[in-house]
Amino acid sequence: LMDSIPMVVITGQVPTTLIGTDAFQECDTVGITRSCTKHNWLVSDINDLAAVLHEAFHVARSGRPGPVVVDIPKDIQFASGTYVSPEHAPRRHKRTVRPVDRSRINEALELMARAKRPIFYTGGGVINAGPGASEALRELARATDFPVTSTLMGLGAFPASEPQWLGMLGMHGSWEANHAMHDCDVMICVGARFDDRVTGRLDAFSPHSTKIHIDIDPSSINKNVRVDVPIIGDVAYVLEEMLRVWKSKTMQVDKAALKAWWKQIDQWRAKKSLTYKPNADVIMPQYALQRLQEHIKGRDHYITTDVGQHQMWAAQFLDFEEPNRWLTSGGLGTMGYGVPAAVGVQVAHPKALTVCVSGDASFLMNMQEMTTAVQFRLPIKVMILNNKYMGMVRQWQQLLHGNRMSESYNESMPDFVKLADAFGATGIRCDKPGKLDDAIALMIKTPGPVIFDCVVATLANCFPMIPSGKAHNEMILGADITDAEVENAIGEEGKALV
């Protein structure tokens, strides 16, 4: 639900005659899933089944996408009934398409034309709105020459190779993206929801900006941050309409102010906030992903990740030129997502290179899905950044608990090469920077599923970072930071916000 995944889950239930009797394996599936789905159904009449299934797929995909559950008792599964086609099925959940307020679009465009320090803040809603939304965003950004940043879920909506791209924003975003967000005077939020990983301290979030918010979900408007110009509607349609009006009115930006704004942004870029200390003896995780980027550049490829430090480093060091090439759990942040996601991607795109960037702990959450990859001959490549820790947990224990480690060190990790062999896949291991390129090349060219155990520095921290409870302009960088500075980065109030 938090990742906006349109998923239809069909579950089994005890026969209708036993519901409510605490029968063997009875479970109140509808009650349990009510809080984490868009809607759910318990089918009690076989003649309702077809209509319910049609409606389930409609609800999952309409508006802001999300999961739904259809619970089917055992006697209903064995029964025969009348099939109803989607066109003739009664629909209880009729989506009300409210007309987009054109006056709001005009108001937004006037603000953009007068802006001195504008920025596009984009999110996963641009991806979910389809390729047309990403294309419209690109055209509108090029027409205005405004800088563009994105949330974790929105990567790929705007090309990373474009000079207007500032990188990801938020807790582990770039220096230039976060400072531009803090200092902007007009913010155009497109398909994002102002979540806590992006905003930092709310009362200090972009304090001097006029905020435009475009979103299909009315409940996202003014939920976390008060906006000045709300535009409720399909992101693709709204962006296309904004672009049409901008061109038809031959609207112009304040070029002098925009030139000064880009000069300031270039000064922030000069910080090179993703810089890290290289190591000739140990593979730094950032270096591993930089090398992966060089090997996959120009290929038809998809990246999935699990959740943790490796996820943030992948977002920082891998470049995405197109939408839907990056699949990660950035809303709920659930470990174990990467491998099954890679399996799904490979089924959908059998000829593409599919790489799952994982961590040693995350991989173990759903490693059984390697059997699926082997069984169906899906050549997914799982690149494990193995630091022998739950890295993000360890980093927070250093930040919040005086470096007192608890349950975050994985002393009894399996031999991932032998584990790959046990699954019937290919295992590769590398722990030397000088051999890393050969190992990545071997991973890519090896037929079938591969587990690549990339042994990286154990205590590397993920920077840059906005400490919890701090504002965008209070970021800390990682290149020269001391352990003492890390441990004192978060105050007492911020500790409760992690």
Report each predicted region and the residues it spans.
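Generic enzyme active-site microenvironment
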Residues: V69, H213, T304, V357-S358
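Structural motif
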Residues: V186, Y302, L353-V355
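Gly/Ser/Thr-rich loops at beta-strand to alpha-helix junctions
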Residues: G124-N128, Q309-H310, S362
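Glycine-rich, N-terminal phosphate-binding loop of Rossmann-like dinucleotide-binding domains
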Residues: T122, V190-G191, V307, S358, ...
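Short, surface-exposed connector motifs at secondary-structure boundaries
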Residues: H39, A113-F120, H295-G298, P323, ...
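N-terminal alpha/beta PP-like core and its mobile active-site loop of ThDP/TPP-dependent enzymes
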Residues: L1-V253, V282, R291, P379-I384, ...
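Active-site diphosphate/adenylate-binding microenvironment
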Residues: K263-P340, V345
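Thiamine diphosphate
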Residues: I10, L18-Q25, S134, N178, ...
